[in-house]
A protein has these predicted regions:
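ATP/adenylate-binding site constellation spanning eukaryotic-like Ser/Thr protein kinases
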Residues: 122, 336, 374
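…primarily DNA-binding HTH/wHTH and HhH modules…
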Residues: 268-283, 356, 363-388
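Basic/polar phosphate-binding segments, predominantly the helix-turn-helix DNA-binding elements
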Residues: 296-330, 354-379
Length: 388
């Protein structure tokens, strides 16, 4: 096998245009740019040992990053000879002790989704994976079912039927949604499954979020926000995964990426059928909490919109009944989610972030952050932000 002599990095087995892999590729490119490398993406196709050797001879890359999500081919580390190789979402048992692997912490995802869905005090839980039995989906479904079991809650799983037609899948999904008990909280292993549930609920005659609540994973805006009911999603930093995979070519270290925060949308915005004004309040909070929105101001605006009195005490009580937590807690969650996004995705000074989260001063935000996450903002950034 030829020794690496070129100035490029190969990203192997990617699906062009896939929103998750676009983000991973961006992370690989960010790291490569710091090292002065070019990045060559190799689209997914049937490949054998000869194909891999031809790629290595042609490019003589400084390293290879192998995509493992939804893979069709096996790329064992020994296939690459003296060329450094790392993996992203590849089966851990196939790389253990031989090459670094960047994985997703499915238990942490399950915890985040369970907490979000539990806020609405559901009567039951359900889970759905990707329509195809990808390993990442099966692991995520299992993690959520185990999380429910630890809480003493049953979890209704949508069964996967490999190879079924789209028409059959949609009909079966609609029937499953129709059969769910009232006030069921549904977790989808990925955004595509979450969007499918959002569509299927309409044909099943079920209303999200008044009858069912829904949370998915990945937080791809073009998928979540285009669903009939926009879908709340656990945010994963795929760009950071790509960065870590490229970085691990030199460090040789495994890495695990957990969720940054939950992007809340209408699919978890309360469930009181006779309380549309509570849903309006949630929308205002999620849009304006980081602008310094106060509860008293919100109550005044709702009073004007309803055209009749809304007392602060009545608002607090009705909001908690519908959402399972107070309006102040909703505002705090939105502000902390914004802080996490700024810490992970920008180079903004930690001491300046409070100005963009609606919190009066750095010390107040730092205290709130430590209470929620058990660590300082600086430490959280060191663990979760892409460097460079």
């Amino acid at each position: 096998m030829p020794a690496p002599t070129g100035n490029c990095l190969l990203y192997l087995d990617i699906v062009p245009g896939h929103p998750v892999q676009i983000r991973k590729l961006a992370g690989v490119r960010r790291y490569a740019a710091l090292r002065g490398w070019d990045v060559v993406g190799v689209p997914r196709r049937e490949m054998d040992r000869t194909d891999v050797r031809d790629l290595l001879v042609r490019h003589r890359p400084v390293g290879v990053v192998v995509e493992g999500s939804g893979r069709r081919n096996a790329f064992p580390p020994q296939l690459f000879g003296r060329t450094p190789v790392s993996y992203v979402e590849y089966p851990a048992e196939e790389t253990a002790g031989q090459a670094p692997n960047v994985s997703i912490d499915d238990d942490a995802i399950a915890d985040a989704a369970f907490r979000e869905l539990s806020l609405g005090r559901p009567a039951a839980f359900a889970v759905i994976g990707h329509r195809h039995p990808h390993l990442w989906s099966l692991l995520r479904v299992r993690a959520f079912r185990e999380r429910c079991a630890r809480a003493g809650a049953d979890c209704i799983a949508f069964p996967v039927v490999p190879g079924e037609s789209t028409e059959r899948y949609e009909a079966r999904l609609s029937a499953w949604i129709a059969s769910l008990p009232p006030k069921t909280a549904v977790f989808a292993a990925g955004d595509s499954a979450g969007a499918a549930v959002s569509r299927g609920a309409r044909s099943a005659g079920r209303h999200i979020p008044k009858d069912l609540t829904l949370c998915s994973t990945c937080d791809i805006p073009e998928v979540c926000e285009d669903a009939p009911t926009p879908v709340t999603s656990v945010h994963l930093d795929f760009e950071r995964m790509g960065w870590l995979a490229a970085e691990s070519l030199a460090s040789g270290e495994n890495a695990s990426v957990g969720p940054l925060f939950v992007s809340r949308r209408r699919s978890t915005a309360g469930r009181g059928r006779r309380e549309p004004w509570i849903l309006q309040a949630v929308g205002i909070i999620r849009a304006e909490a980081c602008g310094g929105l106060a509860i008293d101001e919100l109550v005044v605006r709702l009073r004007s919109a309803k055209g009749r009195p809304v007392s602060r005490r009545n608002f607090d009580r009705r909001f908690r009944e519908a959402m399972g937590h107070s309006a102040n807690e909703e505002i705090l969650s939105v502000r902390l989610e914004s802080a996490c996004a700024l810490l992970a995705q920008t180079d903004m000074r930690v001491t300046a972030i409070h100005d963009f989260c609606g919190v009066g001063c750095y010390s107040n935000l730092d205290a709130l952050f430590r209470s929620r996450f058990g660590m300082s903002m600086s430490k959280w950034r060191a663990r979760n932000a892409s460097r460079g």
